[in-house]
Amino acid sequence: MSKNWFPLLCASVLVVYVSIASSSTGTASGAVTPTSPTENTTGPLIENTTLRTHEVFKINMSKFPYRVCSMAQGTDLLRFEQNINCDSFKPTKEDFEEGIMVVYKRDIRPYTFKVHMYQKILTFRQSYSFIRENHLLGFSQEHLAVPMWEVHYINKLNRCYNSVVRNVAGATYVNYHRDSYVNETMLLVEDDFSNTHSSRFVTVKELWHKPGSTWLYTTSCNVNCMVTVTTARSKYPYDFFVTSDGKVVDISPFYNGSNNKHFGENRDKFSVRKNYSMIAYYGRDNAPEVAHPLVGFFERPDVLMSWDIVEEANNTCEYTFWEQSERTIRSEADDTYHYTSSSMTATFLTSKEELNESDPSFQCIKDKANEQLQLIFNTSYNETYVQSGNVSMYETTGGLIVFWLPVKEKSILEMEELAVAYNNTNSSTRRKRSTDSASDSNKTSEEVLKSIVYAQLQYTYDTLRNYINRALRQIAEAWCKDQKRTLEVFKELSKINPSAMLSAIYDKPIAARFVGDVISLAKCVEVDQNSVKVLRDMRTKESGVCYSRPVVLYTFKNSSHVQYGQLGEYNEILLGRHRTEACEYPSLKIYIAGNSSYEYVDYLYKRMIPLDSISTVDTMISLDIDPLENTDFKALELYSEDELRSSNVFDLEDIMREFNTYKQRMIHVEGKVFDKVPGYLRGLDDMMSGLGSAGKALGVAIGAVGGAVASFVEGVVGFIKNPFGSFTVILFLLAVLGVIYLIYMRQKRAYEKPFEHFFPYVVPPTTVKEAPPSYEQSQYENIKEKAASATKEFSLEEAYQMLLALQKLDQEKRRKAEADDEDFASNGQSAGFLDRLRNRRRGGYQKIQNEYEV
């Protein structure tokens, strides 16, 4: 019992001594740095220890847990690599293949062929002949198509008739050249105005005109027969063609009357002749004849055209040769092939799906492309290379056609054959290609671009990618060499502290020690993380001796026994408390545990410092590289072809189509205008014709009368519409109104003053103006007038005698006036028109004779 109490007594004395020493030290150091309130308090005892809670503090845990890594012998053995082999750097997974490439582009040039145009040009000249000079007033021209029978005559004899017969509105009109009224043939000669793409042959080079008689107008007629051999062009898909003078024909040049080619004109005006013979050239007599297998004729009101009809497949080709590349590298990406040519400085992208060689559009270029590939191979590769495959066709994203012939060196092929023989396998060496084509490569021929800028851009990108990947390969190789050198450094440092080096390398806590030339590894034993506590005081019981690292209290898992150790690096707990040093004053030490650091001043804990507030020494040089992956550039089109066409206000094709349509419409309207027979007369004539001969005769009579009446009415209407006629009618109406006004005034005057009107020769009495009488005199005169107002009444006989006397008097006065007029007229002294007009109301007016005339 006494043996048990003695150790307890010694432990109690030690605890009291440590408490007193810590209190005195805390008081001494408090003069420099303030301490926390818990340092001056007495806490409860820690279980299974003689320490109290105020003498320790808890620490946190971060990446590495608190563990004990001291061991006697490890279970795993490791060694450092002696030689490190650096593998070759391959940025992307690409398979390269060498070959020959021939590129064809879409032929945008139109199909060109010859067209013969037959026309008769009527020129009407009008002139006026004066006394000494003739004046040309102008001319007009009219283009007419040569009849079909006359076209055959021209193609046989190189001659054309000088007359034109037309039927307009049921009437026949005939025009002769030079108004000769003789129908004869004329020789076709070459015109002086032919050019490189057109040749014209005419019958008249100079126009003729004969002036008329003096003060007369004259109109002359010239009939010129013209045959034009010109070129026409038709663009894919060959639905119409355009002649060099701008005439648009909405017919496919390959339409033969029975195939499915486009035809948009009047079918009644189109005909086809097989084995048609015609002269080889115009302008000469006795020209040789040439047979044409199939000739098409199309007639318009102003021209008749003919051209040779041929097969489209034998005379047109949708593609034409563009470029060839003798040295081409093909690389395979996920969905596409890249054809890179350094001579063309371009890279072309195609899908992995091959084109169908039996397509009719490729028949015209397939044989030529194969011959060209074989020629290049025989001249450049035949000695050292062999063909490693057949010719294949691909379409690029820009609409180009690529013919590809893969080649391979003979030495490489021999090595492959040896490898195949060694492995005793019959597997094909041909690489399996994906049949899934890229969605962007399925373009129709109407959507492709007409530019290859995208190919040059793709080549630029691939070139840069190769340069960058080469640089990355060099960096990777240099990095590998640096790792070899770093390994040697780690191996030498591991001899000093193997556990620290191995923990840093494997990024986890490891216990390591050298056992000869190898390293023995053991797993660290983790302790109860919540039981880890650090003493605040780093001083020992011996004077002048302090711990070199803080003392730690901990317990193992599933154990309550408290162990003592010292805090190592990265939360490692070092077994034992034998790591001491001589105390140094003043002293400042900071120890890292978890995510925090703990500051000890003069070997006493002062405060906790956040780890983020302490700067780190960054020796890491990061290397973050990624290889450039494949990127397929797409051929972008800012505006489509239709948008570019519609953005221009002038569209030549539409303008010419509209112009030709307008011309045909005007000719049709002209025929309707000249048809002057009214519809009702046509209906009446049809009705009368159905009644037999009598009805037809009656209809002719009615039509003649109706035509005469209609002609008279049209003449009157035409006269009124004429400016001179309208002015004449207005003057006539004014004259009629004037006559009516004079008659009205005469009748009014006769009604108001009949005596003066019927007896103008009776002179009325002269009125004498006197002063008015006085009142008495006026009364007297009134009495006298009343007395004399009683008049005598006359009988009917007397009235009759008076009328006879008046008649006799009137006759005498009129005879006397006529006699006087005759006398004055004989003497040259008649009254003028103005005098008679001025004195028309005064009957019997005569000019007074002077004394000399008497």
From Swiss-Prot:
Signal sequence: where? 1-30
- Here the disulfide bonds are 69-524, 86-480, 160-225, 317-364, 546-583
Matching entries from SUPFAM superfamilies are given as: Viral glycoprotein ectodomain-like
What InterPro entries does this protein map onto? Glycoprot_B_PH1, Glycoprot_B_PH2, Glycoprot_B_PH2_sf, Glycoprotein_B_ecto_C, Herpes_Glycoprot_B
Keyword Transport on this protein?
Answer: no
Where is the site Cleavage? 433-434
Write out the ranges of the annotated region (Involved in fusion and/or binding to host membrane): 127-133, 212-219
Give the record's membrane topology.
Single-pass type I membrane protein
Q: Which GO terms describe its cellular component?
A: host cell endosome membrane; host cell Golgi membrane; host cell plasma membrane; membrane; viral envelope; virion membrane
Q: Where is this region: Hydrophobic membrane proximal region?
A: 669-721, 700-720
One Gene Ontology term of the biological-process aspect is: symbiont entry into host cell
Functional description taken from the UniProt entry: Envelope glycoprotein that forms spikes at the surface of virion envelope. Essential for the initial attachment to heparan sulfate moieties of the host cell surface proteoglycans. Involved in fusion of viral and cellular membranes leading to virus entry into the host cell. Following initial binding to its host receptors, membrane fusion is mediated by the fusion machinery composed at least of gB and the heterodimer gH/gL. May be involved in the fusion between the virion envelope and the outer nuclear membrane during virion egress.
Protein family membership = Belongs to the herpesviridae glycoprotein B family.
What protein name applies here? Envelope glycoprotein B
Gene coding for it: gB
